[in-house]
Structures are given as structure tokens and as C-alpha cells.
From Swiss-Prot:
This is tRNA uridine(34) hydroxylase. The keyword Cytoplasm does not apply. It catalyses: uridine(34) in tRNA + AH2 + O2 = 5-hydroxyuridine(34) in tRNA + A + H2O. The gene is trhO. It comes from Bartonella bacilliformis (strain ATCC 35685 / KC583 / Herrer 020/F12,63). It is an enzyme of class 1 (oxidoreductase). Keywords: Oxidoreductase, tRNA processing.
């Protein structure tokens, strides 16, 4: 399958007092170059995932890294066979990754970075507690062998999980954390350091860097890695999984899930069928119909029809 679109996942923590002034130039540049995705700007830095042609993404990265505060972003590239986003959004936020705890600053204190090549040895050590900092639906698709699942719906719930599991967290000599691309672990390990935990580690570049770097036969990763775009999830080598999202609840569906009698495109799946009222389902049907009409109009305009 031809990989047409370059996907860039990036973040950089910084003390960015003028972040509001970057919104319009970034949005204009993305629109001019056909780039789609989401970029978040806050006083604490930039975070986002975008996709476009190779040349367009290179133009954007040059623009971002020309900003003195963003000269060395954490940057991860992959490829997609079709555009994985519907539009471009450049948003102003209080945090570039929302934990909801005041005063957490990865620029001041953060866990020790561990390269993918050294990760296996760390998490196989009996004195290491391995913690998956992602949400429950992400964990469901895949995780590292032996990792603890906090069973959280959003990253905001992570501090409360830590508070409720102090005894478990203190049983082992060290804590190793991981997430998709690394940004949540910047916050989570900084938070743990603030609480007094000393030996805190996290996977540099996140799961995506690990899946790209470590050969499948040596990997301790089991399953797929959820990504927040239309690819839904990726496997070793960052190959697309072929999954799709339920548009009603955003549950990741494989081929088997789409064969269920509860599955209706844009309306329901096994995960949400019994939780939705008939009114909700009718509303979702209308939303899906409007989406299909808009999609058809866009295709026709591109074809000059």
C-alpha cells in the first residue's frame, strides 16, 4: 500500500509567554500547505500531530523550530496511506497535555529517559514497576508485558490513581512509565518526582519510537498501539492495523466488530449499542448522513463535477 502522507507527532515544553501570537501564523501556514491535524499551544509549549505531503511537513517543522523556544522538539515521523485527519486546528490551551495539577513543570524535574534499546532490560527487572499512563481504551488494544493498567478514562484521572495506589507504587525500587509518544510521561514522571519518588524512568519517544526501533522478534510489546487519528492503531514497524473507529463512541473496531449485528456505521457498535437511547441513535444517523453528504460534495468539487 502506497504511503502518501507524512505524519509528524511533536511536542516541546517551553516557557512561552507569547504563545497566542503563534496561533494565526501556524494556522495560515498549515492551510497554505494542505496540512491537517491538530496543534495545541500553551504557555508551557506546543503539542500536536499533523499530516501532509513530505514537503509541507518539512516546511512546517522548519517554521516551528525557527522559534527559539522550539529548537529541539521531540519529533516522530510515520506514514499514512490516506490523509488521517479531516481538518486543521490550532488551539490555545492552558496545558498542552491536560493533567490538571498546578505547578507540574517538566522543564524543572522529569524522570530519567530510557532509549528503546535499553527498555526491555529495565522492565524485565523484578525491582521495576511498569505503569501504562494511557487511557483504558488504549491499553485494551495493546501494552507491554506485565504493565500495570491504571484503568483511567482520561489523563486527568492519573493523579488520583497515584493517590489511591501509594502502597503498590512503593513496593518496587523503581517505576518505569510509558505512553504513546512520550508527552504524557513528561508530566507523569515530573509529578512523581514532585511527590518524592526518586527512581522514575520513562520510555524516550514513547511506544511509537519503540515499535519503529525494536525488531518484532525482540519486542516485549503485545498487540497494537492506539493513535489519535484515522489510522486508529499501528503495529510493529508502525504499520497501519486496518481498524476503524465507531463514530458514536470512538471505540476501535476490527473486522470482527464490524460484523456484529450491533454495528451500524456512524451509529453504534458492541461497546455502545446498549448504552444509547433510540433518540441518540437517530441523532447519530442524521449526523452520519450529513457527514456523508459533505464528504461527497468535497469529492465532487475536487473532481470538478
Amino acid at each position: 500500500m502506497e504511503k502518501k502522507f507524512k505524519v509528524a507527532a511533536l511536542y516541546c515544553f517551553a516557557d512561552l509567554k507569547h504563545y497566542q501570537k503563534l496561533q494565526k501564523p501556524l494556522l495560515d501556514l498549515c492551510q497554505e500547505n494542505g496540512i491537517k491535524g491538530t496543534l495545541l499551544l500553551a504557555k508551557e509549549g506546543i503539542n500536536g500531530t499533523v499530516a501532509g505531503s513530505c514537503a509541507a511537513i518539512e516546511t512546517l517543522v522548519r517554521f516551528i523550530t525557527a522559534e527559539p523556544a522550539f529548537q529541539t522538539p521531540e519529533l516522530k515521523y510515520s506514514w499514512a496511506s490516506k490523509m488521517p485527519f479531516h481538518r486543521i486546528k490550532v488551539r490555545l490551551k492552558k496545558e498542552i497535555v491536560t493533567m490538571g495539577v498546578e505547578g507540574i513543570n517538566p522543564l524543572k524535574a522529569v524522570g530519567t529517559y530510557v532509549a528503546p534499546e535499553d527498555w526491555n532490560a529495565l522492565i524485565q527487572d523484578e525491582e521495576t514497576l511498569v505503569v501504562d499512563t494511557r487511557n483504558d481504551y488504549e491499553y485494551m488494544l495493546g501494552s507491554f508485558q506485565g504493565a500495570v493498567d491504571p484503568n483511567i478514562k482520561t489523563f486527568r484521572e492519573f493523579p488520583q490513581w497515584v493517590a489511591n495506589h501509594q502502597d503498590e507504587l512503593k513496593k518496587k525500587k523503581r517505576i518505569a512509565m510509558f505512553c504513546t509518544g512520550g508527552i504524557r510521561c513528561e508530566k507523569s514522571t515530573s509529578y512523581m518526582r514532585e511527590l518524592g519518588y526518586e527512581e522514575v524512568y520513562h520510555l524516550k519517544g514513547g511506544i511509537l519510537q519503540y515499535l519503529e526501533t525494536i525488531p518484532k522478534e525482540e519486542s516485549l510489546w503485545q498487540g497494537e498501539c492506539f493513535v489519535f487519528d484515522e489510522r486508529v492503531s499501528v503495529r510493529h514497524g508502525l504499520e497501519e492495523s486496518g481498524r476503524e473507529l465507531c463514530r458514536a463512541c470512538r471505540y476501535p473496531l476490527g473486522a470482527e466488530g464490524k460484523l456484529s449485528s450491533h454495528y451500524e456505521e456512524g451509529v453504534s457498535c458492541d461497546a455502545c449499542y446498549d448504552t444509547r437511547s433510540e433518540f441518540d441513535k437517530q441523532r447519530f444517523r442524521e449526523r452520519h448522513r450529513q457527514f456523508q453528504l459533505a464528504k461527497a460534495r468535497t469529492m465532487n468539487s475536487h473532481q470538478g463535477l
